A protein has these predicted regions:
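Dual-mode signal for accessory low-complexity, basic/Gly-rich regions
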Residues: 271-335
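Active-site bordering "gate/hinge" segments
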Residues: 1-241
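Intrinsically disordered terminal and processing segments
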Residues: 322-369
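Active-site lining segments that contact anionic ligands and/or coordinate catalytic metals
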Residues: 241, 257-259, 266-269, 291-295, ...
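Short polybasic amphipathic segments
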Residues: 199-201, 260, 270, 350-360
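Oxyanion-binding "anion nests"
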Residues: 227-272
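Short, glycine-/Ser/Thr-/acidic-enriched flexible segments
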Residues: 32, 96-98, 146, 215-217, ...
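Short acidic-glycine loop/turn motifs at beta-strand connectors
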Residues: 204-205, 214, 264-266, 356-359
Length: 369
């Protein structure tokens, strides 16, 4: 059997990004991911792709916020924008040095930077909406195990590496075949939900309703995110009503927020509370468009069995649902626009239920359809 990094590289390029000769591939990562990057670059070159790599180094983000004058803080990153406008494929390999690096940055600076990136975010969401459309950008977000991520997950690096590779099915004889089977299984759920008009998430601390009439559900099958395992859509913006409690911790710009409760009327989040980090919510909901939901979703990856305080994995946990405030996905038919897209997750395995047009379709973390 090939070593893990070779298998990972082939899965990312063959399955996730479907790299072809002549493709322009843009990779964003850190120097810590070098073992994987070497194999990705080697294989991309063998496939005939032109590859450019944007490397982060330790402390770069904090250095930028600490030293950038306002005119730089509010400007667009030139190469990043050009790559998102012109390249064929974008691979974002998360390999952090320090997940708390920007935790103490001035909130006003964060807000200015977020607003400055709005146009680039719009380009990204437009070009990734349909990967099969002419001129589309095929994208994939994945994880390379580092000490920082392992510490955040309360694991050793060895344990965390095993967790990441299991979540991606890299230990399977044929990882690509595993993801093709997941695609087939989730397609049945997607097609059922596409016919639904109104949904309700319900549990001990949650009772929230929303319309998905005219919206499209997406089968997240490991191409855009590796790992994946979810179905998601965008609620009709003014249809969301009720209260939702998120049992998993959420992280925004390096800051922890736990036990989030949101109250919603006619789509707008009118009240919020948190057991920890409530001041972060005050900052978030001052951002344009953040008071409305951009995504509703159901996690289906039962190879992920615990929270690691990493949204790439946590939102896919089998037996959870999540909702995101802010930017909605164009491919779902969502209309909300914002410089933020922040996912929040809750466990459904104890008392959770999902109703579709009044019919119970999901209970205690499992679909009934």
């Amino acid at each position: 059997m090939e070593n893990t990094q070779i298998r990972y590289a082939k899965l990312l390029l063959d399955y996730c990004l479907e790299i072809k000769p002549g493709d322009k591939l843009y990779i964003a990562t850190s120097m810590l991911a070098e073992p994987l990057i070497r194999e990705v670059y080697r294989y991309a070159t063998q496939l005939g792709a032109q590859t450019e790599i944007d490397f982060q180094f330790s402390g770069k983000s904090k250095m930028f916020f600490d030293n950038a004058p306002d005119e730089l803080l509010t400007s667009e990153p030139v190469f990043h924008k050009k790559a998102l406008e012109e390249f064929d494929a974008y691979l974002n390999i998360r390999a952090p040095y320090n997940l708390n690096e920007t935790s103490n940055i001035d909130p006003e600076k964060r807000k200015k930077r977020s607003e400055a990136l709005q146009e680039i975010n719009n380009i990204y969401f437009e070009r990734t909406a349909d990967r099969h459309a002419p001129g589309a950008l095929r994208r994939c977000l994945c994880q390379y195990p580092t000490e920082a991520s392992a510490q955040k997950a309360n694991m050793s690096l060895e344990e965390y590496s095993a967790f990441v590779y299991q979540a991606c099915h890299l230990n399977a004889e044929n990882p690509k075949a595993e993801w093709l089977k997941i695609r087939e299984d989730q397609q049945r759920i997607k097609e059922y939900l596409d016919k639904v008009k109104e949904m309700q998430y319900k549990s001990d601390k949650t009772d929230i309703r929303f319309s998905v009439e005219g919206r499209t559900w997406i089968n997240s099958d490991g191409q855009a995110n590796m790992p994946s395992g979810e179905v998601f859509s965008a609620p009709v913006e003014d249809s969301v009503n009720g209260k939702v409690y998120f049992s998993y911790p959420s992280i925004y710009m390096g800051r922890d927020v736990s036990g989030i409760s949101l109250w919603v009327e006619n789509g707008k989040i009118i009240k919020w509370d948190a057991e920890e980090g409530g001041e972060v919510l005050d900052q978030v909901f001052s951002i344009a468009g953040a008071n409305y939901f951009g995504e509703v979703a159901i996690g289906t990856n039962y190879n992920i069995r615990q929270s690691t305080r990493n949204i790439l994995f946590d939102e896919k946990i089998g037996g959870t649902i999540h909702m995101a405030v802010g930017q909605s996905y164009k491919q779902c038919g969502g209309l909300n626009r914002s410089s933020i897209h922040w996912d929040m997750i809750t466990d459904m395995t104890e008392s959770g239920q999902i109703y579709a047009d009044g019919k119970l379709i999901y209970e205690k973390g499992k679909f009934l359809i």
